[in-house]
């Protein structure tokens, strides 16, 4: 998948197996600050704790042979967007997550007053053969 030169706005991008996300020179991939653009919640880790949350701007889970290449730029949301003002939970994730709950029930998606952990830039989780 090629992102050509120019500025492109996006919510979460999920890479599947055998995909190379290439940003051409002059491409700027800017991610939105809208919490809804990172739904539904996906399996991720926050400070090593498994939860269902926003994941990452560029996300993959159990994918093989994936790549993020090129000379373009990946940008997080601007500072003035809602996501950056959203309550981010306690300073210690263990205070937000009940370890007795199955991971699928550990929702940190920002919905209905739940905690929201901001997405990481790139998170290949449980993936094999990753090239950056």
Enumerate the predicted regions with their spans.
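Extracellular/periplasmic carbohydrate-active domains that bind, remodel
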Residues: 1-132
């Amino acid at each position: 998948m090629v992102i050509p030169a120019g500025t492109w706005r996006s919510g979460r991008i999920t890479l599947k197996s055998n995909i190379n996300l290439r940003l051409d020179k002059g491409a700027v991939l800017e991610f939105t600050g809208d919490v809804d653009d990172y739904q539904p919640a996906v399996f991720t880790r926050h400070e090593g704790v498994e939860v269902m949350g926003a994941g990452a701007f560029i996300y993959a889970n159990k994918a093989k042979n994936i790549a993020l290449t090129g000379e373009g730029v990946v940008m997080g949301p601007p500072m003035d967007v809602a996501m950056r003002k959203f309550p981010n939970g306690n300073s210690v994730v263990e205070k937000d997550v009940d370890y007795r709950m199955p991971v699928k029930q550990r929702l940190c998606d920002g919905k209905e007053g739940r905690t929201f952990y901001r997405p990481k830039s790139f998170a290949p989780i449980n993936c094999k053969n990753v090239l950056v």
